[in-house]
């Protein structure tokens, strides 16, 4: 009886040791996480820094980055290259919804987990999505403008990159909010590509065919709003009572928060990066843990 007890305890101890060793091995397993960024702006630099910081708390994680500089064809090639380099998981922010679907589908069908971050594609072939509610952001800024203008005024909108999901969703939410106020009118819309220069180009195009009042400018992001503001000043427009609003609100002197603080912009909606949460999601997927299919960042 005594020998049986000792034998059973020995088996139990061995099982505990085996589980511990296995658990440690899983925790220390090396992973290659590929990150395909559609651009290299300040917002994406912040995300990159947060992901890199997260690797200090997660041993055995190697990050491989590629930036497409707003070119969907370059991003296609970069995704192929990242996958062929032996990536265990792909994080991708598609430049445009339709042009990147095939490459992302290819990765998913090959058994490589795919996290869509910030942007979606036309396909449902992805492992998880993480990003903010862009429609809500556009709606919120529309209501802000409506409140400040007391429901009356002429509005110009500079939309983000044509074919990108944040641009389409922010526009949709903004128009939905403005349409609730009969006294508000969106007099002109032009597309940009998220850069300050494209905001300038869009506003020049608008002013070349419109010389009426502009009470508010909604930029799809802060940089386009800033570019539009500069052109209005250069054109000799009185902007002392014009609202300029954007999206991103980066906590930097020349970011959205700084621009609102010095009254260059009237408002900027925070567009969260949360690279730490993105890393947790990626590792949960790789380690076979439960994870949400859709995560909306606040």
Which stretches of residues belong to each language-model region?
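Signal peptide-proximal N-terminal region
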Residues: 49-65, 179-182
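Short, low-complexity disordered leader/linker segments with a strong preference
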Residues: 1-32, 105-112
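Hinge/cleft segment of the Venus flytrap/periplasmic-binding protein
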Residues: 12, 24, 162-166, 177-178, ...
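Hydrophobic alpha-helical
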Residues: 80, 89-108, 174, 187-188, ...
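Hinge/beta->alpha junction and helix N-cap segments in small-molecule ligand-binding domains
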Residues: 36-49, 64-74, 96, 119, ...
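Short, hydrophobic alpha-helical segments
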Residues: 83, 145-150, 207, 278, ...
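Flexible loop/hinge segments that line or gate small-molecule binding clefts
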Residues: 97-136, 144-147, 154, 160, ...
């Amino acid at each position: 009886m005594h020998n049986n007890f000792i034998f059973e305890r020995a088996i139990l101890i061995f099982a505990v040791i085996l589980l511990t060793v296995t658990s440690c091995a899983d925790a220390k397993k090396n992973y290659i996480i590929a990150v395909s960024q559609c651009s290299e702006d300040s917002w994406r630099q912040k995300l990159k820094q947060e992901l890199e910081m997260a690797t200090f708390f997660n041993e055995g994680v190697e990050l491989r980055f590629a930036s497409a500089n707003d070119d969907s064809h370059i991003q296609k090639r970069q995704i192929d290259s990242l996958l062929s380099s032996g990536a265990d998981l792909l994080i991708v922010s598609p430049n445009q919804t339709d042009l990147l679907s095939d490459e992302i589908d290819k990765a998913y069908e090959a058994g490589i987990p795919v996290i869509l971050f910030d942007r979606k594609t036309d396909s449902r072939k992805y492992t998880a999505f993480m990003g903010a509610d862009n429609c809500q952001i556009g709606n919120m800024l529309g209501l802000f403008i409506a409140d400040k203008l007391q429901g009356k005024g002429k509005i110009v909108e500079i939309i983000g990159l044509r074919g990108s999901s944040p641009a389409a969703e922010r526009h949709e939410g903004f128009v939905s909010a403005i349409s609730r106020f009969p006294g508000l009118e969106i007099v002109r819309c032009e597309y940009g590509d998220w850069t300050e220069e494209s905001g300038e180009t869009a506003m020049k195009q608008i002013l070349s065919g419109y010389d009426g009042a502009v009470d508010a400018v909604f930029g799809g992001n802060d940089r386009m709003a800033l570019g539009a503001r500069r052109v209005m000043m250069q054109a000799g427009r009185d902007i002392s009572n014009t609202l300029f609003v954007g999206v991103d609100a980066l906590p930097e002197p020349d970011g959205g928060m700084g621009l609102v603080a010095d009254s260059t912009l009237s408002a900027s909606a925070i567009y969260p990066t949360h690279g730490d949460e993105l890393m947790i999601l990626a590792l949960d997927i790789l380690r076979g843990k439960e994870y949400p299919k859709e995560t909306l960042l606040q």
